[in-house]
Amino acid sequence: MFLDTTPFRADEPYDVFIAGSGPIGATFAKLCVDANLRVCMVEIGAADSFTSKPMKGDPNAPRSVQFGPGQVPIPGYHKKNEIEYQKDIDRFVNVIKGALSTCSIPTSNNHIATLDPSVVSNSLDKPFISLGKNPAQNPFVNLGAEAVTRGVGGMSTHWTCATPEFFAPADFNAPHRERPKLSTDAAEDARIWKDLYAQAKEIIGTSTTEFDHSIRHNLVLRKYNDIFQKENVIREFSPLPLACHRLTDPDYVEWHATDRILEELFTDPVKRGRFTLLTNHRCTKLVFKHYRPGEENEVDYALVEDLLPHMQNPGNPASVKKIYARSYVVACGAVATAQVLANSHIPPDDVVIPFPGGEKGSGGGERDATIPTPLMPMLGKYITEQPMTFCQVVLDSSLMEVVRNPPWPGLDWWKEKVARHVEAFPNDPIPIPFRDPEPQVTIKFTEEHPWHVQIHRDAFSYGAVAENMDTRVIVDYRFFGYTEPQEANELVFQQHYRDAYDMPQPTFKFTMSQDDRARARRMMDDMCNIALKIGGYLPGSEPQFMTPGLALHLAGTTRCGLDTQKTVGNTHCKVHNFNNLYVGGNGVIETGFAANPTLTSICYAIRASNDIIAKFGRHRG
């Protein structure tokens, strides 16, 4: 589908160049365009999910009529908004699987013993190396399920929309905090975060009330609070903050994604004139003014390749663009942002690399050599991951009587829903209406229980329910832990292996500390204890630890913070020693965290955008 933004112009530098079109890149674009800056955004993938809205000034502008006549298509729409997936959430599992590309697949130790001996096979000396297959990847230190999504909107086209705030302990100097420090002063830090979170929630549209009239949601939420209150145990169950809104037909909800953030850049003719979006364009690297470590530097231009002309005619000079801007933002996700910056350490052919090892790389033998990054020494170091436990339960039969006769006051709407359903379907063994919205319950991270909990029903790349089970009585439990940042945990990029898009192959080196492992065991115990209070395990979905990386919340790859010796950028996400280079996304978060990071990453994008606007802003009519 044609995207109606301002065409690319090579003859005039942009104010801001942005690599990446997920919610973080979109936040940069929105705020910079709102501040009268000209923005060029490139996305390696295609635009494959759309909504449409009226143009600004149209008398129907307040209405949201999807794909009405004469309306403007907006990319980056959440694919779960399709009616078929709202009616059957488990069918969305395959959409997620299709969107994800695994980052690093070990191959050196994979011998297929039963392969026909006369066919092509791998060997120890020459293992397979295509499409993420990585001979340099040690399987014992891999994040085996870490994956990326390429396309306008990024993972926001299939995410859960969970947008909790990070935990900050009362003691500013407590040994662990989810929420990073943006100031050394406790009061100022709290004020900054309060303001940023408020803005971020407005941008993405966070709510905790969209499931208030769900029977299952209220059943799970109220039952758990009653159980723990009777046991004299302090555990606070509350609605999970979600970026969504309930539609006029209460059976349906609209899940928010990048389209919400980009909307005015398509519907407002003035803003659209300052915004260019190039899809199927790979940001190959940034070219720097010089390559001398430790000295003040800046980006000269972004080297971008249009993949469509190249696909039709390899070597077509029209496929390569040099995009000049006053400031540059790389916000392609935790893996790809670091990938672009690592690849940027390999300069054009006519530039001599001044740092030792720049020609051959480091990190092992020639075959497994990695790209050195002395211009950004902390790039890829101190990465963090979320250990994750999962199970599904079938609700206790006794709870069906609670559904028929809820013991809590003020629930006439509940009783009316049940009565209508029972009357319409007297042979249904379950009194819950077919279109009753799913539960969306959370337990927040605390010092006593340092993990994030989601008790709900949603689609992931795993956890689909068998067709012969009624999903109305299935509840999912996902517990997310955290790992402490360690310098030895790192993401590096190979010199001699390439990914599917001809970029340096990522390789993980990640292990959990003893404290991390002990905490994960406690988290599993907690999940089992909580889950069994209202049901029994669904066969095949008993409690289990998930493959590392499956949470898709990798962070720390481009960490930003107050300590210049342990970070890639400052608290405004400006890369150290570069006056016009910024990073965005979950990779900037320097702390270990258990909650979903998108809202916090939007906060960083707001703060960084304000810095860009202050430095590079100028009035435009």
Curated annotation (Swiss-Prot):
Temperature dependence: Optimum temperature is 55 degrees Celsius. Thermostable for 2 hours up to 70 degrees Celsius.
UniProt organism field: Phanerodontia chrysosporium (White-rot fungus)
Post-translational modification: Not glycosylated.
Active-site residues annotated for this sequence: 553, 596
Protein name, UniProt field: Pyranose 2-oxidase
pH dependence: Optimum pH is 8.0-8.5. Active from pH 4.5 to 10. Stable from pH 4 to 11.
GO molecular function: flavin adenine dinucleotide binding; pyranose oxidase activity
Activity regulation behaviour: Inhibited by HgCl(2).
Cofactor note: Binds 1 FAD covalently per subunit.
Gene Ontology cellular component annotations, sorted alphabetically: periplasmic space
Matches recorded under SUPFAM superfamilies: FAD-linked reductases, C-terminal domain (SSF54373), FAD/NAD(P)-binding domain (SSF51905)
Pfam families: GMC_oxred_C (PF05199)
Subunit structure as annotated in this protein's UniProt entry: Homotetramer.
Leading EC class: oxidoreductase
Induction of synthesis: Induced by carbon starvation.
Entry keywords, A to Z: FAD, Flavoprotein, Oxidoreductase, Periplasm
Cofactor: FAD
Compartments reported by the entry: Periplasm
Flavoprotein recorded as keyword: yes
Catalytic activity annotation: D-glucose + O2 = 2-dehydro-D-glucose + H2O2
Entry function: Catalyzes the oxidation of various aldopyranoses and disaccharides on carbon-2 to the corresponding 2-keto sugars concomitant with the reduction of O(2) to H(2)O(2). Plays an important role in lignin degradation of wood rot fungi by supplying the essential cosubstrate H(2)O(2) for the ligninolytic peroxidases, lignin peroxidase and manganese-dependent peroxidase. The preferred substrate is D-glucose which is converted to 2-dehydro-D-glucose, an intermediate of a secondary metabolic pathway leading to the antibiotic cortalcerone.
Enzyme Commission (EC) number: 1.1.3.10
Principal subcellular localization: periplasm
Gene3D superfamilies in the record: 3.30.1920.50, FAD/NAD(P)-binding domain
Residues the record lists as Tele-8alpha-FAD histidine modifications: 158
